[in-house]
């Protein structure tokens, strides 16, 4: 609502000798019913209100409000038996020095994205800060004997270099926050993202990851930088997916 175009043009049409007409996606005759339904499946929450309903709404409150502990989680005994063989495995990392470091063990079979395990080290709570070498040791132990791709926040240059020396295949994450949140929200809303109940920190963050209301009042859109470490790691993975996964 605080976007300059809305403030200057939408709310003051007479000032510019302009006419404001509100259109929804259903008013676009060039879009087929199939295309409209695809977009309606793609967007959730505030993004649905904006891109489908055409509303100027603020991003506020819980970001992943569409997350359901009933529909977006699974118990360990519900894990598909052939998951490891029928899925591509990736470890997504949000690296911190004073902030927590999180690893997410992700299995993707092309239809469902399963976050099966998580690693957490909070140097403040543990009163002990780990080195890049120690984190690399932990990641290799977390990975186990079967190697896989590791996606890491690009700002963690020294950690990426340490993993490279260990022979780990590292991909620098796409750290686009707004687009990553939009994509992640869509996959959560369509129940494509499934989280094992043992990943308690990631599940907790689904309810505590919130928009920054003060930034919204300035016309900016960004999340509060706290309780976001597992959510960031998940976003890094989602940003690595091809566009067709969001259709």
Predicted regions located by residue number:
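A residue-level signal for conserved active-site and pocket-lining positions in enzyme catalytic cores
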Residues: 23, 52, 94, 103, ...
């Amino acid at each position: 609502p605080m976007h300059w175009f809305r403030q200057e043009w939408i709310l003051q049409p007479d000032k510019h000798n302009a006419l404001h007409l509100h259109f929804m996606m259903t008013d676009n005759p060039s879009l087929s019913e199939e295309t409209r339904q695809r977009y309606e499946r793609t967007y959730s929450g505030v993004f649905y209100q904006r891109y489908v309903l055409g509303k100027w709404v603020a991003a506020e409150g819980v970001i992943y409000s569409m997350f359901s502990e009933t529909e977006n989680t699974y118990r360990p005994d519900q894990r598909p038996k052939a998951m490891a063989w029928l899925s591509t495995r990736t470890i997504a990392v949000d690296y911190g020095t004073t902030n927590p470091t999180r690893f997410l063990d992700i299995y993707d079979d092309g239809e469902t994205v399963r976050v099966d395990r998580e690693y957490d080290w909070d140097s403040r709570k543990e009163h002990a800060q780990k080195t890049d070498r120690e984190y690399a040791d932990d990641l290799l132990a977390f990975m186990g004997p079967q190697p896989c791709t590791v996606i890491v926040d690009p700002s963690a240059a020294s950690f990426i270099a340490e993993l490279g020396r260990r022979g780990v295949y590292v991909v620098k994450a796409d750290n686009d926050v707004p687009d990553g949140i939009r994509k992640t929200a869509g996959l959560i809303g369509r129940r494509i993202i499934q989280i094992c109940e043992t990943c308690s920190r990631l599940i907790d963050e689904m309810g505590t990851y919130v928009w920054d209301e003060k930034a919204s009042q300035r016309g900016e859109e960004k999340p509060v930088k706290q309780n976001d470490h597992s959510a960031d790691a998940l976003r890094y993975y989602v940003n690595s997916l091809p566009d067709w996964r969001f259709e």
